[in-house]
């Protein structure tokens, strides 16, 4: 009996082991998530795993970063090469064609193996932001019906706006008032002299002033997992990789948007006032989050064949890099 009491006492003295934290991409989709939303999340999460799960934490700091866009390194499956995967995002989303006037684009359309075309393509991948190509690739892989594939995020933001309250496959919503859900996209405006927020974006879209505005969108893969009041997003070409971002949610499930300042509105990854002496200015989540694209489609496009050739987007060739 004394021995049993001794064991119990020793057990109480043992340090508590930390609970295993769940990975947002490893949790099965909750009840009620549509089939197309499941497909979008699965495609985005699959790519995030390939890139060794880098992420930006709730404080807007890069907490982990593995291989990057132009490296000749294997991804997590030990088969795909990093730069070739990015070239695949361009090719397989039908967004490479509109970039044809830009040096190196034609080389990315060629099979890998030639030293000249490989180097030319890798230079193209470095010089031309591929985040919209990544989004378009995910939507293609998930067979989202009617999605506007484009090398510019603003094109599908505009399409969601033009669709109105019944827009398909996405409708435009205010991220400050509507709750994000898996399969949605959250977007910010960049390289502007001042912040606009949702109201300013709506005014600009209504007057036709958005043109080739620079913007950036990321895919919602989980929201408030286990009541943690955290939004989990995945985007491409974030720190030159496929990165997960964490944002805080309020008690109602709406995003607690970090307030953008003049510095973060005019830059994308590196904030102007961020320095070792001013750590409080270093927050990659402090952006002009102006658009929440709510997924309205519920079922993937019928008879989808991921290996079939895709028609090019309706956009004209783009003479200069225009997207992030």
PLM segments and residue spans:
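Bacterial N-terminal signal peptides
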Residues: 7-16
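Surface-exposed intrinsically disordered loops and tails
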Residues: 71-76, 83, 92-120, 162-170, ...
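Short, well-structured beta-strand/strand-turn elements
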Residues: 142-150
């Amino acid at each position: 009996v004394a021995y049993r009491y001794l064991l119990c006492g020793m057990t109480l003295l043992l340090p508590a082991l930390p609970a295993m934290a769940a990975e947002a991409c490893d949790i099965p989709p909750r009840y009620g998530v549509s089939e197309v939303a499941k497909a979008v999340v699965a495609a985005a999460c699959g790519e995030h795993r390939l890139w060794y799960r880098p992420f930006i934490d709730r404080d807007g700091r890069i907490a982990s970063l593995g291989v990057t866009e132009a490296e000749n390194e294997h991804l997590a499956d030990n088969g795909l090469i990093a730069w070739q995967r990015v070239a695949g995002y361009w090719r397989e989303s039908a967004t490479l064609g509109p970039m044809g006037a830009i040096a190196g684009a034609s080389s990315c359309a060629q099979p890998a193996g030639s030293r000249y075309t490989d180097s030319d393509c890798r230079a193209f991948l470095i010089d031309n932001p591929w985040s919209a190509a990544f989004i378009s690739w995910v939507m293609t892989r998930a067979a989202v019906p009617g999605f506007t594939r484009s090398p510019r995020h603003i094109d599908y933001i505009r399409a969601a706006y033009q669709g109105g309250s019944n827009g398909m496959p996405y409708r435009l919503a205010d991220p400050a008032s509507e709750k994000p859900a898996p399969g949605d996209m959250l977007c910010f405006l960049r390289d502007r002299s001042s912040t606009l927020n949702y109201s300013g974006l709506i005014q600009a879209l209504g007057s036709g002033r958005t043109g080739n505005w620079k913007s950036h969108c990321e895919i919602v893969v989980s929201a408030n997992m286990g009541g943690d009041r955290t939004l989990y997003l995945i985007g491409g070409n974030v720190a030159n990789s496929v990165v997960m971002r964490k944002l805080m949610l309020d008690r109602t499930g709406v995003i607690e948007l970090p307030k953008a300042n003049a510095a973060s509105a005019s830059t994308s990854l590196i904030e102007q006032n961020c320095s070792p002496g001013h750590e409080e200015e270093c927050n990659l989540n402090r952006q002009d989050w102006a658009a929440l694209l709510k997924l309205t489609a519920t079922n993937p496009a019928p008879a989808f064949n991921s290996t079939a050739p895709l028609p090019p987007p309706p956009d004209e060739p783009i003479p200069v890099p225009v997207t992030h």
